[in-house]
Amino acid sequence: MGSIATNPEGITNPPIDELLEKTTSKYALVIFAAKRARQVNAYYSQLGEGLLEYVGPLVETTPQEKPLSIAMREINGGLLTAEPTDQP
């Protein structure tokens, strides 16, 4: 018999409804979170090279936390803002 976590993490934390309040649409949220997750991932990749081109996580992280989870917590915390661009 499998075990079920009593406090599931991931997309349920932060709640999707709270995240949607921070953007204009669910599609904007996906793009916003994905771009920030790529930045966080690039930051971790460049640490060993001594380059500091990207901004690291703006929230406390755990060692195995995924960049997308970090990005969503940053968005939910109001630490990031989405700026509309004129580019397609």
From Swiss-Prot:
Transmembrane segments: none
Species this chain originates from: Salinispora tropica (strain ATCC BAA-916 / DSM 44818 / JCM 13857 / NBRC 105044 / CNB-440)
Native organism taxonomy: Bacteria, Bacillati, Actinomycetota, Actinomycetes, Micromonosporales
Pfam family, one: RNA_pol_Rpb6
Superkingdom in the source lineage: Bacteria
Gene Ontology MF, one: DNA-directed RNA polymerase activity
Keyword Nucleotidyltransferase listed: yes
Top EC class, one word: transferase
Record's protein name: DNA-directed RNA polymerase subunit omega
UniProt-listed HAMAP family: RNApol_bact_RpoZ
GO CC field: DNA-directed RNA polymerase complex
Catalytically driven reaction(s): RNA(n) + a ribonucleoside 5'-triphosphate = RNA(n+1) + diphosphate
Known role: Promotes RNA polymerase assembly. Latches the N- and C-terminal regions of the beta' subunit thereby facilitating its interaction with the beta and alpha subunits.
A Gene Ontology biological process term: DNA-templated transcription
InterPro entries, per database record: DNA-dir_RNA_pol_omega, Pol_omega/Rpo6/RPB6, RPB6/omega-like_sf
This protein's UniProt keywords: DNA-directed RNA polymerase, Nucleotidyltransferase, Transcription, Transferase
EC code: 2.7.7.6
SUPFAM superfamilies recorded: RPB6/omega subunit-like (SSF63562)
Record note on quaternary structure: The RNAP catalytic core consists of 2 alpha, 1 beta, 1 beta' and 1 omega subunit. When a sigma factor is associated with the core the holoenzyme is formed, which can initiate transcription.
Record bears the keyword Zinc: no
Family: Belongs to the RNA polymerase subunit omega family.
